[in-house]
Amino acid sequence: MNFKVINKSGITLIALVVTIIVLLILAGVSISMLTGQNGILNRATEAKEKTETSGEDEKRKLAQAEALMNTERTTYKGVTLPEGFAPTKIDGEDSIDDGLVITDGYGNEYVWVEVPKTAEVYKTAGLEITDFSDEECGKIESDLKEYTKVYRSGTIFEDEYVADNVNQGWFNDKKEYDDAKYKMLKSIYKNKGFWVARYEAGIEKNRISSGRAEEIPISKPNVYTYNYVGRTQAKVLAEKVESGSYTSSLMFGVQWDLILAFMHNKGNIDNSLLVEDSKNIGNYANNLWSITNEKSKYSKDNGMNYYGAVYKKDNSENILLTTGADKSFSEMNIFDMAGNVLEWTLEKAYEDSSTCSYRGGMFEVDGNFNPMANRSSDYVTSSSYCIGFRVSMY
């Protein structure tokens, strides 16, 4: 009996669809006008998407207006926001489990990276630290390294001081470096996470050579990557970002690894995508992506010239993109940690002249060569079109 009812309903639905199509044809509407590339159905879908985008834009503007009025720290869904920030409250961005997004009054966006404060994570530090002595901070660091060991892969890179005798703005000595690191670790332990820029550090005007870099980096979509800066320049620039009473900083190595753990544990992203081959989640040479974002731009000559907006790769190509060009490059609402440009961190690489560290992949290589967890080294004098950075707040 149930089978017959379902079958009858199915026939009725099919008959209704056929009837509508026949009536449209009788009214002079052809099948191609209905289903073609510029057909009624496709246009209706596009109109729906544009309406949704328009709705999101309005919510973003409202959040930015709210942020301008937030002169004190606020709490939202159990997370403390810096002064001058507000949650976007947009579907898909309004949950810690999805990657909670906040904005300042000018459209700079950050994502909350949750770091669980549990006995499983802090096996040696425990959950009762209040004084945060150097020894206790060392235990916190050791526990977080163990928690993220799958992304370290036995590396010798460490969040340790190494001198930079060439550039101005680096840490003066080991104590100054350790003080900054312990401040970060203390904040993560107390607040159960930290904020990270949703986008690679960006800049409004395209930068095509090394040298002085004074423009404050932004965290917005569809702007040029802030490249051609050295590691120490990136540190200085990150510290200039307005963050209220929070600290804005270039990321330490452990923070990068904690983001990957967050993506895996909350976003159910398979570690093979993060550690072995990130092709499908980043702008790599062998990712044959199709960009439909009309506000994005692309470059085929390492950022010397950009063109907009949409582009489809049919073959392996080296194409540099503006920030946040496509949602397929986003995990937990954090864009471009795999591919596009490499990103400087505060981590020490080697003891010799190649002491600086950058993470992730870039547009000139395949996804299995430089996956998201990748660590590489370079010199204190190095800067390039393919190296940028990202800001964190804690």
Label each residue range with its predicted role:
Residues 1-11:
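N-terminal leader/signal peptides at the extreme start of proteins
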Residues 106-107, 135-336:
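Short aromatic-cysteine micro-motif
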Residues 33-58:
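Aliphatic-rich helix starts adjacent to a transmembrane/signal segment
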Residues 10-32:
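N-terminal single-pass transmembrane signal-anchor helix
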Residues 116-120, 199-203, 346-352, 363-365, ...:
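Acidic glycine-/aspartate-rich tracts in secreted/extracellular proteins
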Residues 229-232, 236, 242, 247, ...:
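Disulfide-stabilized, aromatic/cysteine-rich ligand-recognition loop
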Residues 73-123, 248:
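GGW-centered surface loops in extracellular recognition modules
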Residues 50, 57-75:
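Beta-strand/loop motifs with alternating small/hydrophobic and polar/acidic residues, enriched
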